[in-house]
Regions:
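Non-heme di-metal
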Residues: 1-278
């Protein structure tokens, strides 16, 4: 009986090793996880600005600092640990530093000037997209450790979506945010996640390997072309989620760097918040 249990455990370990080996040579998974790890880790860049936006809501500031920030930081740490265990040749520190130096000066610019309601709506978009990404990853991953990591992240981002959605409903009446303004904000947040956040996180991934990379290098356009059908196939998208991902299906466009909003009061409510991507 003991010998049977030992053989079963050995088979399980062998199966897990084979699954990890398959992941190790999967370029799409590497680029997805590495980009996600950067964006999760970079959340502190957004916290101070968000605290200013929601300064009148002390409960929101407390939640951002005690729940949202630590939760995102934990996901960043878990992703980094997984990456370093699976792809030890990849220099995560150097790649993240390059991303951080490029991302920091521009992060959050598109959201400055937006009110609390539109900022909350942009954060809804970000959380929904992240939850869908992780859900697709959990449903398609062969390795148990990766499935567990992705499921936890999907659940946590889903909880953030619920929080930001309730916050948007709470703020929109005071700021008189209309349907068209909301829709423009959603579209702008989706495009910003696609053209700025994910693109910036993707940019340094091919340049920081010690020796020959174990995965083929992907251009960002090719990455998008492969990632979108994977999400469509494995994430079980609802109607609203399909709308959120529509911009990812559009043709590539050269996206300008986010600019500070023009000082035109009558247009301010149309400015989309800069989402915190995942």
């Amino acid at each position: 009986m003991q010998a049977t249990a030992s053989k079963g455990a050995q088979r399980e370990r062998s199966g897990q090793a084979r699954a990890r080996a398959i992941v190790r040579f999967n370029g799409l998974l590497f680029h997805s996880l590495a980009a996600a790890s950067f964006l999760e880790t970079a959340v502190p860049l957004h916290v101070n600005r968000l605290n200013q936006v929601f300064a009148a809501c002390s409960d929101v500031v407390l939640w951002l600092e005690q729940v949202w920030w630590p939760q995102r930081a934990e996901h960043g740490r878990r992703l980094r640990d997984y990456l370093e265990a699976t792809w030890p040749e990849f220099n995560w520190n150097a790649a993240y530093q390059e991303f951080y130096d490029s991302y920091r000066p521009r992060s959050g610019l598109a959201g400055r000037g937006a009110g609390a309601a539109l900022e909350a709506l942009g954060l809804c978009v970000t959380a929904a997209q992240a939850a869908v990404f992780y859900r697709a990853l959990a449903n398609c991953a062969d390795e148990p450790a990766l499935r567990a990591l992705a499921r936890r992240a999907a659940c946590d981002h889903g909880g953030c979506f619920d929080y930001f959605s309730a916050l948007f409903e709470r703020c929109k009446h005071d700021e008189r945010v209309g349907l068209m303004t909301s829709w423009r904000t959603v579209r702008a947040a989706c495009r910003s996640a696609r053209d700025f956040d994910a693109s910036a996180a993707f940019e340094p991934l091919g340049r920081h390997w010690g020796g020959t990379p174990t995965v083929p290098e992907l251009g960002y356009g090719e990455f998008r072309a492969r990632m979108v059908p994977l999400i469509q196939r494995h994430a079980a998208l609802g109607r609203i989620e399909r709308l959120l991902f529509r911009p990812w299906l559009e043709s590539d466009r050269s996206a300008p760097a986010p600019q500070l909003p023009e000082k035109r009061p009558e247009r301010r409510t149309l400015l989309a918040p800069q989402p915190v991507a995942a």
